[in-house]
């Protein structure tokens, strides 16, 4: 409590405020091997529930009056931890119940403080939710039916009121990098979610690596891509094959085989101000599409620039951390 009060004072003195948090990582997220442990503890555990509720209590204390707040979180769990159909179903059910406990906690916070906070579920490659179709299915098959029963029992609400509560407090975190890896066009995704009544709590402004095949040979491309192979984070690679997205669960798999391709996209958050670096490109075009859409359709009021890989970038892209962050913000403000 004293730390929180101290932090509040510092925020006030520096004329800044907190309206969003990244609740996906748990514990240290830098300078050590993370890989699939980024999902630990997942939503099948009480640890994840307790951690998230505690973060929301802190956000409720920090959030200035008149603002809304949100916390992004993992897409239930890591897909490959649940080997059978039954195990996957159980993980979705348990994860949904724990997220619904958070939704009821947020309902209580709003009743007591007047502050509206939402949990923003963040799909990502190899997560149990990777794309908008899987989000829709999670709501339809798990959150809504389980939630109607659970909220009805605990809060005495009828089915319609329970569904409204779920849609109010459980939203999507639209990470631009992640949805570009799913080869989804922003307009299509936004319209699909809106039609299903699913809100976008937060948009994370981020870019993935885009690798376009060179007709005269890819040696330079493979050499450039190898510089992004580092041991801290998972860097899934996706490819669109016959209309479907194929995922390789880490960069070394692609680098080892070096087979022919037209376009690959890699889960490596690169500086948003770079469209191209040497033989490689970025999905910066997706950021520009999202920004254009937002000007006409304000689907979310929370935007968070989310490049977290500064420590592991190839040396040619590394700059002073503060300067890099300022450059990203300046680029974004200039374009938006």
Question: What do the predicted segments below correspond to?
Answer:
Residues 18-23, 67-73, 117-123, 170-176, ...:
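Hydrophobic faces of well-ordered beta-strands that scaffold small-molecule active sites
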Residues 32-171, 181:
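Active-site acidic/histidine proton-transfer and metal-coordination neighborhood
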Residues 2-24, 59-66, 104-114, 139-144, ...:
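Acidic (Asp/Glu)-rich catalytic clusters
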Residues 2-7, 89-105, 136-146, 186-189, ...:
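Well-ordered, non-membrane alpha-helical segments in soluble/globular domains
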């Amino acid at each position: 409590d004293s730390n929180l009060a101290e932090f509040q004072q510092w925020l006030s003195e520096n004329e800044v405020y907190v309206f969003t948090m990244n609740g996906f990582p748990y514990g240290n997220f830098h300078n050590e091997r993370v890989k699939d442990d980024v999902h630990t503890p997942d939503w099948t555990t009480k640890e994840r529930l307790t951690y998230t509720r505690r973060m929301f209590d802190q956000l409720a204390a920090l959030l200035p009056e008149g603002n809304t707040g949100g916390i992004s979180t993992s897409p239930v769990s890591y897909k490959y931890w649940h080997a059978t159909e039954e195990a996957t179903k159980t993980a979705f059910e348990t994860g949904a119940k724990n997220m619904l406990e958070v939704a009821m906690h947020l309902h209580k916070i709003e009743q007591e403080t007047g502050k509206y906070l939402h949990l923003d579920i963040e799909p990502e490659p190899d997560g149990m939710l990777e794309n908008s179709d899987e989000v829709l299915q999670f709501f339809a098959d798990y959150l809504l039916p389980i939630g109607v029963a659970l909220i009805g029992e605990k809060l005495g609400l009828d089915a319609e009121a329970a569904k409204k509560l779920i849609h109010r407090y459980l939203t999507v975190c639209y990470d631009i990098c992640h949805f570009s890896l799913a080869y989804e066009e922003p307009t299509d995704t936004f319209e699909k979610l809106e039609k299903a009544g699913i809100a976008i709590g937060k948009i994370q402004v981020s870019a993935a690596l885009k690798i376009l095949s060179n007709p005269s040979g890819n040696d330079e491309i493979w050499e450039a891509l190898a510089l992004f192979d580092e041991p801290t984070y998972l860097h899934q690679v996706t490819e669109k094959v016959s209309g479907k997205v194929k995922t390789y669960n880490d960069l070394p798999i692609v680098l080892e085989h070096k087979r022919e391709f037209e376009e690959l996209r890699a889960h490596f958050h690169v500086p948003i101000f770079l469209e191209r670096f040497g033989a490689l490109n970025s999905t910066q075009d997706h950021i520009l599409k999202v920004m254009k859409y937002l000007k006409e359709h304000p689907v979310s009021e929370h935007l968070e620039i989310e490049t977290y890989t500064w420590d592991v970038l190839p040396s040619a892209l590394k700059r002073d951390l503060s300067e890099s962050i300022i450059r990203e913000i300046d680029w974004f403000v200039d374009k938006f």
